Amino acid sequence: ETNKRKIHRVFEYEENVKMLSNYIKTKIPTISNGICHGTRRGKEQDWFSKYLNCDIFGTEISETATKFPKTIQWDFHDIKDEWINNFDFIYSNSLDHSYDIPYCLSQWSKCLKNNGMLIICGTTAHHPLASKLTADIGGYTKKSIKETITNIPQMNVIDTINPKKKKLIYLSWYYVIGQKYI
């Protein structure tokens, strides 16, 4: 399984999570929780917890999830009843692992509180053409993610952010930020 082969790797950078955390604080004054989907070994939720000083957990579909704190084994297409309207933000750099991206984002939006934020990381590696060369199921572009979020009821795209740090092999690296309104 690809996840087990890459278990010691972390896709995201701590500096970028710090930047995103500062951004979240400007939009949501009181942050109590969040969820990171597809976290492999859970570094993203550790960093968000550190910079936002709140409870963050992650999901990972692989059975390796149980080896890491604050990570549950879970298919991120599914949501629990107690997650509905419960989270201040949801972050993922693993959306290319979705078998149905519009459905997945729609499910995640149900879990956001009013004004909650959906943060999707994208790179050239997430592009549909690149995903055909990897083990990833799907792919997306900045434009397609923005359109998909905009088409979800009660969701708007509020920003696109370029990170301070990125891997040199990727020609582009960005975050699309959606926000729920009721």
Outline where the language-model segments fall.
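Class I SAM-dependent methyltransferase SAM/SAH-binding core
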Residues: 33-79
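Core SAM-dependent methyltransferase catalytic element
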Residues: 151-182
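A short acidic, Gly/Pro-enriched loop at the edge of an enzyme's catalytic core
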Residues: 77-90
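A short glycine-rich, Lys/Arg-flanked "PGG" loop and its adjoining helix->strand segment in the class I
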Residues: 102-117
